[in-house]
Regions:
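Hydrophobic beta-sheet segments that form the core/acyl-binding groove
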Residues: 83-127
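Hydrophobic, proline/glycine-rich low-complexity stretches
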Residues: 1-101
């Protein structure tokens, strides 16, 4: 399948900003779920909790067959049947604190197409 990358270029540079608050309730639920796997020196807010913050919300009926939010909201409308997380790098600059407001800024930095064993793949790099 050929992907028209030119039609996806308008998404380059698109930014999404979301905020969330590190509530004691969220931290308690995270600790209860991952108790045995948490690093003892994590402090008041355990490492990894950032995956539970600033989540996208979409009505269940609007989710795609792959369980993701509809394409074309933040991510470009890539004409392929499924999406997956390909990897990331996380740097902890300072410890998070209970009650802190956390801001996530995501920017689409690059869109590339490659041929894999299963066919065409499109990689959307989000910074």
């Amino acid at each position: 399948m050929q992907i028209d990358l030119e039609s996806l270029k308008p998404w380059l540079g698109r930014t999404e900003t979301k905020e969330d608050i590190l509530t004691p309730s969220l931290i308690d639920r995270f600790r209860a779920t991952f108790d045995a796997h948490l690093w003892a020196g994590a402090g008041d807010v355990p490492l990894g909790i950032h995956w539970c913050l600033t989540l996208d919300s979409a009505p269940g009926g609007s989710l795609s067959d792959d369980g993701h939010s509809p394409q074309g909201r933040f991510l470009p409308p890539v004409p392929l049947p499924s999406r997956m997380w390909a990897g990331s790098d996380v740097t902890h600059i300072a410890p998070l604190t209970v009650g802190q407001t956390v801001t996530r800024r995501s920017t689409i930095g690059d869109i590339t197409a490659k041929q894999g064993r299963s066919g065409t793949l499109v990689f959307v790099a989000v910074n």
